[in-house]
């Protein structure tokens, strides 16, 4: 009987994976409206993440990464152990927490095999996400603004209007805890829509400090978000408070909210920029070593490291690398030194903003535009990027 059941589950899973292989996958984030929830449901949400932390740490403490009884766990408090009941988490939520610990060990093992230096799996101070593994069981869509979660109840959410409920297929979801509140990230699959194949223009991109993004057509993009005076004041206040106290935790949560808001602003700008580039252009760029830029010391108030920290270079680079039609040069390729006319190299210090070739006399008034110039890229590769489609 059990073998027959497992066989049906295996066949059903295989059919689902085959069907979804030809569909578009995306994740939609919806926010739980805490002001429309009862105190009991808010307490359950809080307890879910607290119990998930207890269970995760109990699993990590075992040698086999498994527990026979997950109804209660031992928690270390001030040097002694206390028994805590796991009442709010459903059975499938408990399974997801245990699986996440095993997956983390597997990821560490893979990193170690690649030669990376790894340590042992550590205990968590806070659990920030819980996997809701099965649609229709662990969670359900009740209406256009309500989601039901096992052992918690019906939650009022904002953002379900992004989804056409009749045309998508739901997979798993994640219950997320952020400084700004609670969220549910829904994984959905939809049928691929036929897209017209249009010719895209091939342009070069240079990443820099004075101008963050310089394109070969002369367009420049700059976006910085410096620390606000409010954030600086909160950081000073936090340094004077007792670590671990309630006031310390409240101040830390306010700081995290500000950082989350700034991160959302940067992501919004990068996503809009990436959409325009992906739809209309094939980008040729260089694999800049941004981590080394962060370590560069400068006497100026707004130095190299801070420009990288407050800017969007890292986010833009990650988006460009994920697009398979773009072309990335190695970081060691001398694009700034190469002359697009004769191909010779001429070194220029960072304070020289005008490019001048000492061999043939070629001159470009903006060294960043010269670095992003497609003629320079073609000289470096000794091929025609337009002819080869840059793909």
What is the meaning of each model-derived region?
Residues 75-176, 306, 310:
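Acidic carboxylate diad motif detector
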Residues 61, 71-74, 112-123, 246-253, ...:
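Short coil/turn segments at secondary-structure boundaries
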Residues 2-99:
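Gly/serine-rich nucleotide phosphate-binding loop at the start of the catalytic core
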Residues 3, 8, 25-28, 34, ...:
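Positively charged, helix-rich recognition surfaces that bind polyanionic ligands
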Residues 29-31, 146-148, 169-174, 181-187:
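Ordered hydrophobic segments in well-structured contexts
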Residues 18, 171-174, 189-195:
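Catalytic micro-motifs at enzyme active sites that drive phosphoryl/nucleotidyl and oxygen chemistry
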Residues 49-52, 97-105, 251-262:
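Short amphipathic alpha-helical coiled-coil/interface segments
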Residues 59, 96-109, 369-380, 384:
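Stable alpha-helical structural segments in soluble proteins, enriched in small hydrophobic residues
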């Amino acid at each position: 009987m059990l073998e027959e059941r497992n066989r049906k589950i295996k066949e059903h899973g295989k059919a689902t994976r085959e069907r979804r292989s030809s569909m578009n996958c995306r994740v939609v984030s919806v926010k739980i409206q805490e002001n429309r929830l009862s105190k009991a449901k808010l307490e359950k949400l809080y307890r879910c993440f607290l119990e998930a932390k207890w269970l995760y740490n109990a699993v990590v403490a075992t040698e086999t990464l498994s527990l026979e009884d997950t109804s209660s766990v031992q928690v270390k408090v001030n040097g002694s152990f206390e028994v805590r009941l796991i009442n709010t988490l459903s059975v499938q939520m408990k399974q997801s927490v245990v699986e996440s610990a095993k997956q983390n060990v597997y990821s560490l093992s893979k990193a170690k095999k690649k030669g990376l230096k790894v340590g042992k799996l550590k205990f968590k101070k806070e659990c920030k996400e819980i996997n809701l593994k099965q649609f229709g069981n662990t969670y359900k869509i009740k209406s256009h603004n309500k989601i039901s979660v096992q052992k918690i109840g019906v939650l009022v959410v904002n953002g379900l209007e992004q989804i056409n409920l009749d045309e998508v297929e739901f997979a798993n979801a994640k219950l997320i805890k952020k400084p700004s509140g609670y969220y549910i990230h829904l994984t959905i699959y939809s049928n691929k829509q036929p897209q017209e194949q249009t010719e895209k223009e091939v342009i070069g991109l240079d990443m820099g400090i004075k101008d963050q993004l310089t394109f070969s057509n002369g367009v420049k993009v700059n976006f910085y978000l410096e620390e606000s005076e409010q954030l600086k004041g909160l950081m000073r206040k936090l340094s004077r408070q007792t670590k671990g106290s309630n006031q310390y935790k409240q101040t830390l949560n306010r700081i995290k909210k500000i950082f989350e808001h700034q991160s959302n602003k940067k992501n919004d700008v990068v996503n809009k920029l990436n959409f325009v580039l992906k739809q209309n252009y094939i980008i040729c760029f260089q694999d800049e070593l941004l981590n080394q830029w962060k370590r560069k010391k400068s006497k100026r108030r707004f130095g190299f490291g801070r420009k990288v920290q407050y800017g969007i270079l890292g986010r833009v680079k990650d988006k460009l690398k994920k697009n398979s039609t773009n072309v990335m040069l190695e970081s060691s390729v001398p694009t700034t030194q190469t002359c697009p006319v004769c191909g010779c190299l001429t070194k220029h210090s960072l304070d020289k903003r005008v490019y001048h070739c000492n061999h043939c006399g070629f001159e470009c008034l903006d060294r960043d535009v010269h670095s992003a110039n497609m003629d320079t890229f073609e000289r470096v590769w000794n091929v025609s990027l337009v002819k080869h489609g840059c793909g």
